[in-house]
């Protein structure tokens, strides 16, 4: 653990991550510890999925994790028990390289994706192709 006192703000870094710098936005948004842990989990799932397959683009999925989580949990109208519901909001991500952002949120949101699906990212016949498709996922 190290302390940085060179700036106006004193930060304590734990495992390379500053707690002081990483939490203020979450606090302003009214997020609790569970929300922060969910976003951290989404980031780790994205990194792990790309590591497992050996190629891909984890950066965008990791950086979009807070936005995607906020939309999925607090903004979008949807029902995991009825994914074909006509009245649901749709999450359209024009950046196909970040399909992993969508897959992680579907996994965390209870839409039927399992950890094994994330682990089979970008493999032939998987539920999680490298670029989003209409029916597999």
Language model features with spans:
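N-terminal acidic, proline/glycine-rich, low-complexity intrinsically disordered segments
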Residues: 1-15
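Short hydrophobic/aromatic-rich motifs at helix boundaries and adjacent loops
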Residues: 18-19, 38-42, 127-130
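Conserved N-terminal diphosphate/IPP-binding helix and adjacent helical/loop segment
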Residues: 29-45
């Amino acid at each position: 653990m190290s302390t940085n006192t060179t700036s106006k703000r004193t930060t304590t870094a734990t495992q390379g991550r500053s707690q002081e710098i990483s939490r203020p936005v979450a606090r302003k948004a009214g997020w609790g510890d569970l929300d922060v842990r969910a976003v951290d989990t989404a980031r780790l799932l994205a990194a792990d999925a790309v590591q497992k397959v050996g190629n891909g683009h984890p950066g965008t999925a990791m950086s979009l994790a807070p936005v995607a989580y906020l939309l999925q949990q607090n903004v979008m109208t949807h029902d995991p028990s009825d994914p074909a519901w006509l009245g649901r909001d749709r999450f359209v991500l024009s950046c196909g390289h970040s399909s992993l952002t969508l897959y992680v949120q579907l996994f965390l949101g209870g839409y039927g994706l399992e950890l094994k699906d994330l682990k089979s990212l970008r493999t032939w016949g998987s539920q999680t192709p490298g670029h989003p498709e209409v029916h597999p996922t």
